[in-house]
Design a protein with these regions (language model features):
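An acidic, glycine-rich "communication" segment
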Residues: 27-29, 34-38, 46-47, 120-196, ...
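Bacterial N-terminal signal peptides
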Residues: 11-20
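Bacterial N-terminal signal peptides that target proteins for export
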Residues: 1-12
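Surface-exposed patches in mature extracellular/periplasmic domains of secreted proteins
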Residues: 62-70, 113-116, 134-141
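Aromatic-Pro/Gly-enriched surface loop or interdomain linker
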Residues: 24-82, 86-89, 179, 187-188, ...
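Alpha-helical scaffolding within the catalytic cores
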Residues: 65-72, 94-99, 164-168
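Short alpha-beta junction capping motif
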Residues: 30, 82-121
């Protein structure tokens, strides 16, 4: 009984911290999530700065271009309403990290996962540690995340070919709330990068930024 009471107390304490801090920082906060396992969490170094600049221009946000990098197990994740995770391969969350991320999501936080190719099997395994009661479900094309400032009637845009599969947007929904959006076979982050990095067309670059802006607006307007 004591263990359950202690867990509840910690959860509500984290919830209070999240809401208290997010009210003060929500206008200028997106964080890159650093994780273990070797799956290059640091991929796409120009992607978030470019997305933030685009949002500041198109959505009139006031986001800090010099975004923070936060470890999964850090209490600092509760300062940021939106976390971004990317990479190509293995992802490993310790049990403490999984619990920390779970508390963050249940307290109102949001996680965007962007498969930079090769992330799928690992992130699905690790997110089961975080929300074992939830499965990734493909979001319908009429979901509000595709219809913010920019309309994507067919869901995620295809930015990079990879396995030539259709891009899919998956979600983890906890008690009716979308807490995690997972962009798969799309590679939004590569599309956000400086054009010369991947030699993307201007059209793909803009489409990727527009979809990213939709995610940001969806999170900040919830």
């Amino acid at each position: 009984m004591y263990g359950k009471q202690k867990t509840s107390i910690l959860f509500f304490a984290f919830s209070f911290l999240f809401f208290a801090f997010s009210q003060a920082n929500a206008q200028n906060s997106i964080a890159l999530l650093k994780y273990g396992g070797g799956g290059d969490w640091y991929a796409n170094p120009t992607s978030l700065p470019n997305l933030i600049k685009f949002c500041n221009s198109e959505l009139q946000t006031n986001l800090e271009v010099n975004h923070p990098t936060i470890e999964v197990g850090s209490s600092e994740i509760f300062l940021y309403p939106l976390l971004h995770l990317t990479g190509h391969g293995n992802v490993v969350f310790s049990q403490d990290e999984a619990t920390n991320l779970r508390n963050y999501l249940l307290a109102g936080g949001f996680l965007h996962i962007d498969d930079n190719y090769g992330l799928d099997a690992y992130i699905r395994r690790e997110m089961k540690k975080v929300l074992p009661e939830c499965d990734f479900v493909e979001l319908p094309f009429n979901h509000p995340i595709y219809h913010q400032k920019f309309t994507f009637s067919n869901g995620l845009p295809k930015i990079h070919e990879h396995d030539n599969k259709q891009p899919k947007g998956y979600g983890l929904i906890y008690e009716g709330r979308l807490v995690c959006f997972y962009s798969y076979e799309c590679d939004l982050g590569d599309g956000w990068e400086d054009i010369e990095v991947h030699n993307d067309t201007q059209e793909k670059h803009i489409k990727a930024l527009q979809m990213g802006a939709n995610i940001v607006r969806y999170v900040f307007m919830q």
